[in-house]
Amino acid sequence: MSTGRHLPGGARLSSFRELYGRTPACTARAPGRVNLIGEHTDYNGGFVLPTVIPQVTTVELAQRGDRIVRVCSAEVGDDRPAEYELGREARRHAWVDYVQGITWVLAQAGHTLRGADIRIESSVPLGSGLSSSAALEIALLRAWRDACRLDIADVPLALLGQRAENDFVGAPVGVMDQMACSLAEDRVALFLDTRTLEFARIPLPPGIDLVVVNSGLSHRHAGGDYMTRRRECEEAARLLDVPQLRDLPLPRLERTIGGLPETLQRRVRHVVTENQRVLDAIAAMRAGDVALLGRLFYASHASMRHDYQVSIPEIDLLVDLARQDPRVHGARLTGGGFGGSIVALVQEGAGCDVAHRVVREYDAHSGQKATVLVPPP
């Protein structure tokens, strides 16, 4: 998720030794994630179904003898480190806020840190709806955990990452991204109940290729439309006198929401039906029913487009181009929306061909430059 601040990723960065004159004491990694289905449900206490992608964020760290943190990232474009002092973290509205947020939240949780030299490199594309910020947070937390021998299990680690992004960076994200980056596995979906944090690992059905295409249009989570959607959901829950929209039953939904303003009706309808689609998707995966899973993808996209209103014409174009190919079972916007990426279920062996055909036609029709992220080059 992008918040309008630059996150590490992309450019060539000098080695740790070239930057700091020594070798790192530890190296930690965390993957990006793609959400298969269950969009904008996490901050409503609902269900999500993400899996990891091949792109990762890598953090190298060596502790210092003082309380200074120096950090270099590939995104900055030079080797001059950002610098701050532990205990004096202050929001700068820059990429280093994610690093500061992690040391701040660790201190808030009672952990003792020393200063450190840090190098960050990432192949998770920014603003693509694939959790570049969560991958960074989890990689940083893992590095600090290893370096300082902190006793933090993977679920509490994810919660610390979410708290850093919520309370320090200022992005009102749910917990899905950090949980996925901390717990998910390749070709295994993580079914997560975001209220209870209970989870189960669901293998992807055989016979499919997963395709992820980045539209080339980034999104933002620390303000604007994303924050508006969250506030609309909170207001709808208040008016309906439920703790969260997750608590509304699907039967008689239209009668339940009939007294709300039309905009809030749309938001509630998406969240409640999307929660059911997650449960239906799990049943389809366990049954190996790829056709049903694909139909759920298309239904999810239609709901995000018409009821939650987070899609944009370029994303709709990508989904429509994918739908035209008989080898595609389903496709949808993935991530927070307002740009980002689509995820598609494709007949096994056809993923690369389908992805590159969609990109060529998209580039020709939109004037934008899309990128195939999965399958990786």
PLM ranges: what are they?
Residues 126-127, 329-331:
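Short pre-catalytic strand/loop immediately N-terminal to key active-site residues, enriched for Gly-Thr
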Residues 2-33, 37, 58, 62-92, ...:
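C-terminal nucleotide
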Residues 2-28, 33, 38, 46-47, ...:
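Gly/Ser-rich oxyanion-binding loop with an adjacent helix/lid
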Residues 134-135, 341-345:
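FabD-like malonyl-/acyl-CoA
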Residues 46-65, 184:
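Structural signature of FAD isoalloxazine-binding scaffolds in flavoprotein oxidoreductases
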Residues 40-43, 51-53, 275:
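A short catalytic or substrate-binding loop motif that flags glycine-/basic-rich loops and adjacent residues
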